[in-house]
Design a protein with these regions (language model features):
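Juxtamembrane interface at the cytosolic side of transmembrane helices
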Residues: 311-353
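Hydrophobic H-region at the start of alpha-helical membrane spans
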Residues: 11-20, 307-311, 353-355, 397-401
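Alpha-helical transmembrane segments of multi-pass membrane proteins
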Residues: 25-28, 316-321, 359-368
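Alpha-helical transmembrane segments of integral membrane proteins
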Residues: 352-615
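Juxtamembrane/start-of-transmembrane alpha-helix segments at the extracytoplasmic/lumenal side
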Residues: 294-308
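Short, Lys/Arg-rich N-terminal segment immediately upstream of the first membrane anchor
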Residues: 1-10, 297, 338-345, 432-434
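An N-terminal hydrophobic leader/cap segment in hydrolases
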Residues: 4-46, 54-56
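Soluble extramembrane regions of membrane proteins in the secretory/endomembrane system
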Residues: 39-297
């Protein structure tokens, strides 16, 4: 009877998950298409040297070759993709602009390597200008971060091929060959630079040792005094925020806007989006004059978040139903060994020390270990072609080695009487008692669950032209290239998550009174805290000085600091999935393999490919 009740609960949960995926995808699609008034097309075109470029093309109703509309090229930043320009694309297209949201080279579905062909910006503008539905006398460009450098290159090649541009958290001059700006180039420029931007010195700091900036350029508020920005605005005085310099009619207009937001949130803030909309309404003709403050893109993000939650929720009932309903997997259902009883104040002190180490070590060594990839020349290669993923892989492998060493030390000093079975590592004793076939079945179960989750994404992406995402956390459909990359990274990440699961459930699993199990919900919550607390502390260390008017504590580590925003939600998913399947199977493998599949999928499908590999 209990098994039947659990199956009914799983079926109900399955339907809830599927409904969330459907409702989220439908909401995202309705907003993305402005309720059917925008045709969103997933396109490919051939750029420089045969490079296949990927983009989303937003075409408003009524736009034809006989009634062309103004066009805007939108380009994302480093290790992002075309979907993260959705806020700009939605707001501009609903105002009548044809929008090309481009995947930079090596990003999304555009051919690698990253940085090639001026990031793809020149090819993107050339393609937009080739469309007969676009008014070639009314073209704008918007680029976030590295996307700003891409449109800078495009503006340099097509000096009269655009009318205005917006740099979101980006700059001109001295960066990857982007020319220095002045009072006349680029044409009609709006600089949207966050109040708490982490990349001030990179984007606007002086690279000329003979002409250093008069202020500390790691402090965002000092950007108004930057030599390069003042030259861009044609002034020797601090640039005034909000003031329009020059002339729109002459193409020399300039404006600085500084919304209260951080660099990676430039794509998700009404102030940054509104500033871009307002600028194009001032500098381009032919669009609808909908107030810049009237924005609906938030609902698309809410839709894809709902769908993402639905997919994660789906993992639990699918796993439960497969184990209870498919004979091949039934033997994996087992009760976990009793948790270790925490006895007296000494026991609690020992557990708390372990908790501090578990939560603190990954965050403490995050910036150092990821940096070792550069020191050790662990560069992007044919086998491991993603630079940032390489840094993360090296970090987790080193953390895994430390964690395994500490676990073994704890076992031999404090818990020598425990067996491998007590830790969820084996089903018996000795080599044959490990249960090798059950480990294989655990992997096959995890693979089946992940595949079913992937199918929901594939169907949703095909039908709604949206993926599962929120902000920087994304699950994208995998093309052939990214599937190869996924396979390359899967084994190293799986090794780490097996060790993580061993430490989480073998050592850190808390017991209730007299060593009895606590509820699964409480255990999930404890594991979430263990997974993310260290990184929340690291973010506080970095950002409290920045938001207080200074700079990041470790100002040179701005890029890897921004990656943490992707890691924290992933670690929440890790804690939930790992805990659930440990409680269902009594062993660490299904959860470890499943999160390895999910995390490797999320990272590799959404990360930048920096090596020049054959597609």
């Amino acid at each position: 009877m209990q098994s039947e009740s659990h199956s009914k609960q799983a079926i109900v949960l399955l339907w809830i998950a599927l409904i969330l995926i459907l409702v989220g995808g439908l909401l995202a699609n309705l907003v993305q298409t402005n309720f059917g008034k925008i045709d969103v097309r997933d396109i490919r075109f051939v750029g420089t040297n045969g490079t296949v470029m990927s983009a989303l093309l937003y075409v408003p109703d009524g736009v034809t070759n006989k009634t062309p509309a103004p066009g805007v090229l939108c380009i994302h930043g480093y290790f992002n993709s075309r979907e993260q320009q959705g806020s700009f694309a939605i707001e501009l297209s609903r105002r009548g602009y044809v929008v090309l949201a481009l995947d930079e080279t090596g990003h999304g579905y555009s051919d690698p390597p990253a940085f090639a062909n001026a990031f793809g910006g020149i090819d993107g503008l050339a393609y937009l200008r080739s469309l007969d539905i676009v008014d070639k006398n009314n073209i704008g460009m918007e680029g976030h971060s590295m996307g700003g450098w891409a449109i800078g290159h495009a503006a340099n090649v097509f000096k009269d091929g655009y009318k205005s541009m917006v740099l979101e958290g980006s700059g001109t001059g001295g960066i990857f060959g982007v020319p220095a700006g002045d009072a006349t180039w680029p044409r009609n420029l709006c600089v949207v630079f966050s109040k708490w931007d982490e990349f001030t010195s990179t984007m606007w700091g002086s690279f000329d040792p003979k002409n250093p900036d008069p202020v500390d350029m790691t402090v965002p508020s000092n950007v108004v005094n930057a030599n390069r920005l003042k030259a861009q605005f044609g002034t020797t005085q601090p640039v005034e925020i909000g003031k329009i310099y020059g002339s729109i009619a002459d193409g020399t207009a300039r404006q600085l806007v500084m919304p209260p937001v951080i660099h990676p949130a430039d794509m998700q803030h009404s102030g940054t989006v509104g500033a871009a909309v307002d600028w194009f309404q001032k500098t381009l003709t032919g669009g609808k004059q909908i107030p810049a403050s009237s924005q609906i893109w938030h609902w698309k993000e809410i839709g894809t978040l709902i769908a993402l939650i639905g997919m994660i929720l789906l993992l639990f009932p699918v796993g439960s139903l497969l184990m209870s309903g498919v004979g091949f997997f039934k033997e994996l259902q087992m009760t976990p060994a009793a948790p270790i009883a925490i006895q007296g104040s000494k026991g609690w002190i020992l557990w708390l020390v372990g908790a501090v180490l578990f939560a603190g070590i990954p965050a403490t060594f995050y910036l150092h270990f990821t940096g070792l990839a550069t020191d050790w020349k662990f560069n992007a290669s044919t086998l491991f072609p993603q630079g940032i993923t390489n840094q993360l892989m090296l970090w987790v492998l080193l953390i895994g080695a430390i964690s395994l060493g500490l676990f073994l030390l704890w076992h031999f000093v404090f818990n020598r009487q425990a067996s491998a079975a007590d830790y969820g590592l084996s089903w018996g004793t000795g080599f044959m008692g490990v249960g090798w076939m059950k480990i294989l079945k655990s992997f096959l179960l995890a693979l089946t669950i992940a595949f079913i989750a992937y199918l929901t994404l594939a169907v949703s992406a095909w039908f709604f032209k949206t993926d599962f995402r929120y902000w920087v956390v994304t699950f994208k459909p995998i093309d052939a290239l990214h599937f190869r990359i996924f396979l390359s990274y899967l084994i190293p990440f799986a090794a780490f998550f097996v060790i993580l699961s061993l430490a989480m459930h073998g050592q850190m699993r808390p017991g209730g009174k007299e060593g009895k199990e606590i509820s699964m919900g409480k255990e999930m919550l404890i594991n979430i805290v263990l997974m993310v607390l260290g990184f929340l502390v690291l973010l506080a260390i970095q950002y409290i000085p920045l938001i207080s008017g200074g700079s990041l504590t470790y100002a040179s580590e701005s890029l890897l600091t921004c990656v943490i925003y992707q890691l924290i939600p992933i670690f929440v998913i890790v804690a939930l999935v790992n805990t659930y399947f440990y409680r269902k199977t009594g062993h660490i493998y299904v959860g470890a393999f499943l999160i390895a599949l999910l995390v490797t999928w999320s990272l590799t499908a959404g990360q930048v490919t920096t090596a020049a590999i054959i597609t």
